[in-house]
Amino acid sequence: ILANGRILKGKSLGCQGTTVGEVVFATGMVGFEETLTDPSYYGQIITQTYPLIGNYGMNSEDKESGKIWAKGYIVREACTTPSNFRSEETLDTFLKENGIIGIEGIDTRSLTRILRESGVMNGAITTEFDPEAEPEKLAALMPIIKAYAVTGAVDAVTCTEPQCFAPTAGVAEGEEPLHIALLDLGCKKNIVRCLCKRGCRVTVLPASTTLAELKALAPDGLMLSNGPGDPAENVQVIANIRDMLDTGIPAFGICLGHQLTALAAGAKTCKMKYGHRGANQPVTDFALERTFITSQNHGYAVLGDTCLLYTSPSPRDRQKS
């Protein structure tokens, strides 16, 4: 059930019940387990544009966090007989274990077109009533759908205590590894893995970390992770980052971390019409005159007239990033 009144019927996937969230679409053909467990999807109902999901199953190694953060899951067809030597369970079982309500068998191409043309919008998945046969229940649910908003997202997904990780490779004998402070705004496990594989010692910090707490660690660099929600909502985090940038510690932001860094430096952000979510997003570096295919997951962008370095080459989507 979409906020604009459109109703799409399908078959229950995962748990029974009703869930409300912001409906978005992701264009990846693979990586569905990473998508589901990515904290950046907090509060959202994910639509997979690729028609068959779950064909290589789910496993305990590919999770980007300890749970599913999305509010719901929409697929054209969920595979019930996955085939892969690493597979441990089906998509349906994984959703049920995490208490997630999903739906399959709907026209995901049609839904994606709606979101592309109208922009992402709120919606609901329900197994509790037929909205066409019971209009009074639909009328009661619609105000809840329309009023839904993703708020307090960073506070919900960040860690509560610092966590330390040792390098797994890349450190010569007798050398001290670089120490990276990683501000957890909704951090994916793979960011930590990539840093450790490159010889870094990583300290993951809560989003509320202050300048004094950062200085006490004396890191060689600061990384700000991905994360969910409206970047402008995180007023205190932005103020803390501004103080951190003034120290001269080399800093690098990914996704929400990039947006918060931009806000701390005086730039502005905006909500995109339907965002970039998938592993096939083109980005042009005008200085190098090269286009790269990138993996992205964000619904907000830094306004180009305040801080432009890279932009999408697509004439239909000139969102700055």
Where are the regions a protein language model picked out?
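Cysteine-nucleophile active-site neighborhood
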Residues: 216, 220-221, 225-301
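Flexible loop residues that form catalytic
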Residues: 78, 227, 316
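Conserved small/polar residues in nucleotide/adenosyl-binding loops
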Residues: 310-315
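Active-site environment of divalent metal-dependent phosphoester hydrolases
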Residues: 189, 301-303
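RNA-binding accessory domains that recognize and position tRNA/RNA substrates
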Residues: 1-179, 185-200, 205-208, 212, ...
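Glycine-rich active-site loop/lid that clamps phosphate-bearing ligands
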Residues: 304-309
